[in-house]
């Protein structure tokens, strides 16, 4: 699953991304978590699944220090979008893509919920939110009021999990997948290896259903 490593220079900043191309007219932009990068199981297999279904993939390689999350959510969103927007624009400007979708984990759900879901040009894009940061009101409200199709996955042992919120989100167009006994990394229990592998397999299976339906 080797892609082309590319970079964009903006002022004195370099923003790197990897573009994995299979000659498709659809693309999935992926946004990693703070410590959960594209080599980790969920991203690895989600990337493989996209390529299997003839969807090109873009991994955006941002990194932020721990102090960013101490700032107001509007600031966090702007900092992230300042890195993400130029790459989305660069990838889409060729006109090769008719369809786009967005997949983020944890930190990577911030740009999806607080920006991309609200943009008219992406109103038909599927949104995939893995362990979203639902304790932030802006993220929860945005997902609740969005009309997007897609998928939301969260473990019921995740510190971001709230049963009342999930019940409300059931009214959205997103398919909701709750992983029993799973934490923020979607690990099941403390060291339950087989159950954790099964949980990831189930998430990828559900993602396949979402990706396949037009």
Predicted segments with their positions:
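Gly/Ala-rich beta-loop-alpha elbow adjacent to hydrolase catalytic centers
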Residues: 102-113
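Acidic catalytic loop of the alpha/beta-hydrolase fold
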Residues: 135, 156-161, 184-185
């Amino acid at each position: 699953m080797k892609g082309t490593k590319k970079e964009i220079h903006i002022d004195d900043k370099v923003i790197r991304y990897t573009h994995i191309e299979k000659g498709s007219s659809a693309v999935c932009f992926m946004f990693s978590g703070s410590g959960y990068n594209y080599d980790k199981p969920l991203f690895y297999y989600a990337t493989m699944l996209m390529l299997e279904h003839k969807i090109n993939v873009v991994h955006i390689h941002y990194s932020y220090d721990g102090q960013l999350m101490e700032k107001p959510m509007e600031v966090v969103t702007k900092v992230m979008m300042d890195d993400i927007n130029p790459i989305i624009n660069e990838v889409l400007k060729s006109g090769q893509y008719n369809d786009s979708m967005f997949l983020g984990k944890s930190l990577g759900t911030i740009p999806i919920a607080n920006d991309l879901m609200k943009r008219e040009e992406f109103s038909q894009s599927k949104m995939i939110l893995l362990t979203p940061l639902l304790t932030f009101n802006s993220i929860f409200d945005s997902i609740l009021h969005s009309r997007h199709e897609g998928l939301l996955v969260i473990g019921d042992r995740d510190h971001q999990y709230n049963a009342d919120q999930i019940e409300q989100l059931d009214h959205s167009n997103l398919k909701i997948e709750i992983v029993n006994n799973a934490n923020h990394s979607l690990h099941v229990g403390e060291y339950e290896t087989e159950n954790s592998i099964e949980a990831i397999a189930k998430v990828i299976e559900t993602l396949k259903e979402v990706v396949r339906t037009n």
